Amino acid sequence: MKNRLLILSLLVSVPAFAWQPQTGDIIFQISRSSQSKAIQLATHTDYSHTGMLVIRNKKPYVFEAVGPVKYTPLKQWIAHGEKGKYVVRRVEGGLSVEQQQKLAQTAKRYLGKPYDFSFSWSDDRQYCSEVVWKVYQNALGMRVGEQQKLKEFDLSSPQVQAKLKERYGKNIPLEETVVSPQAVFDAPQLTTVAKEWPLFSW
């Protein structure tokens, strides 16, 4: 009887801790792209790709820059990552409905933009952490992560050097302003709300 009561109490308490996706949540994963390892080495982090959650028709999508900027169903996005691993960060204290609406509306400006393989700080093309950063900045005036210069990253490894040569040849733009997935992850306004969560209700 005691065991049954314990099991019931655990089942009742689980929903209080379950992650409920909200527009504005920022999700991170290890990408399977050809540049993923170079990003990890240059930024000294596990996470090489990020996107922002947007709830559309009551279903969660990840707004991401990969190919063109687009919405990807959340479960599909997670499946694309290395071993299905992911971490979700949210503005501490949560976002108001109005703030979530502003983020969703601002995100639409970037839909269809081509991927920025040169990591330049312009609005013509976008890479993953750049578009998340710009949506937050333009919608809420919030800087989720510190901008850096390309030269501030660890560019010493052979994998990073090879990718730089592939993208830029001999003219590496060391003074280019960039924002990395790790910089977004480390934004002090954010707190972790989910990590490799195994159960989905959508």
UniProtKB/Swiss-Prot annotation:
Residues 1-18 form the signal peptide. SUPFAM superfamilies: Cysteine proteinases. Keywords: Signal. The keyword Hydrolase does not apply. Transmembrane segments: none annotated. To E.coli YebB. This is Uncharacterized protein YiiX. It comes from Escherichia coli (strain K12). The lineage of its organism: Bacteria, Pseudomonadati, Pseudomonadota, Gammaproteobacteria, Enterobacterales.
